[in-house]
Amino acid sequence: MTKMKRTCAALLAMTTAVSLAGCASSGGGEHGYLLEQETTTALTVAINTETLAPEQEEQVADLADSLTGELENKNVKWLSFYDPWHATTQGNTKPVSMELFEKKYGGEVEYYQTTWANQYSDLSTFVLGGEGIDFFPASEAVPKCVISGMTQPYDPYIDWSSPLWESVSEVNDMFKIAGSHYLMVCQTTEGYVVYYNRKVMEENGFEDPKELYEKGEWTLTKFKDMLLEFVDPEAEHYGLDGWFNCTPLYLASGVPSISISDGKVKSNIMDPDFERAMTYQSELNRNGLILDKSLFDWKTQIQYIGEGKELFYIGGLYEIEQSPDIWTVTFGEPEDVFFVPIPRDEDADKYYYNAEFDCYNLCKGAQNPEGVARLMECVIASYSDENAIEISNEKHKNDFGWTDEMLEMKREVKRLTTENPVRDIYGGMPSETSSIISDAINQPIQGGDWYSVRESITEAVDLSVQEVNDAVAAQ
């Protein structure tokens, strides 16, 4: 779902709402109120129509031969505000999964474009109108789309005993609700990372965060200590930038605000580990370590990293999974740009990591559920096959300007995300509850007192959780 994240990041740079100033994949920022005219970034490049090399074509053909089944209906309909299946002007190229879908099944994905703000209303219109939309982004669809009847289980269309689906069964079971799978998780993908500039680190006497990570010393405490030493607004030295800060940091505790346990939705607002994570963010704000975007027209200042004025920026790998003509404009000279995992919470029992999932939902009334299932298998295969991974790596180097060192760190982030993934699903709660939680968990990093905030929302959140569980059980 990297294209979605890239779009969200671009849009959030344009908003001025204070409530959007902190969280990531489950935070207020990503759940912002986006306008139709804000659905593209300002800087674009020519669409990359380059085809695979002959050797890569052969590798794709071999992988396609390993897939099973036939597909009578070759068209699947995708509803979203972004298109991850085709090359676009944002610098991304056609994914290996789509190469497989075309090669094996002669399949095609028909893109029904919507906006972030209108995606669920458009989905409802299409479902009720019998358009036969097949699938849509799933990051915030469970449980609300289960309750509203906009999605359906995909269990009848896949074989959990097959090697492909067995390889992702555990992560899919994380989101199993009322005995069925509604969230089609094809893979746990790399979560958010910390970007920095090596030249800035060296000039300020800091050890390279990559070396700290390799020694097991890259912790939340070390992260805060480095910010404390660097930040000096009078000298134009700023700390942590980015719209997506709070969620990756609090998920390092291993506890999301809302989760699914034993097939039911559960609130963790009162959990002591969640409390610890919130108070850590209060400390970051209290010490002036978060870039005050109100001083910059509510815009991130990523270019400050390259200029030596900013220490850290939290974002997804999508930030540099695009043409270097785009990302070098914001991050600086490519040899100085690097990233490391979100720091480890040394008080947690494991190195928990904010998880991104390549995941989708099967629409109610889908005209081609079998086609969606086969496409999902192409996606899973593209993540697990060594040749497909190598093709992806070559794309990163040739199309995105990545180095082998970047690819190695990407694999390390993937390992952390796969071993101990944590995902907050409060965005899938009813909109009023989602907004309440979003505003609440943004407060500490903006200077709010977590204890008073928590007291003000606990009763409402608990009631909503009970109502959601009752509604799911009644389906």
Report residues per predicted region:
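Sec-dependent N-terminal signal peptides of Gram-positive bacterial secreted proteins and lipoproteins
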Residues: M4-S26
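Conserved N-terminal structural module of periplasmic/extracytoplasmic solute-binding proteins
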Residues: A9, C23-K144, S148, Q367, ...
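A structural signal for short loop-to-beta-strand junctions that line the ligand-binding cleft
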Residues: L67, S124-F126, I133-D134, A138-S139, ...
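Extracytoplasmic/periplasmic solute-binding protein
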Residues: K77-L79, I177-T188, Y192-V194, T219-K266
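Short helix-initiation/N-cap motifs at beta->coil->alpha
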Residues: Q113-D122, G216-K222, K293-E307
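Short, solvent-exposed loop/beta-turn-alpha elements that line the ligand-binding surface or hinge
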Residues: D155-S167, L212-K215, P256-R276, V329, ...
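Glycine-centered hinge/linker elements that transmit conformational signals in sensory
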Residues: D225-L227, D262-D297
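Extracytoplasmic/periplasmic substrate-recognition and gating elements
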Residues: T328-N398
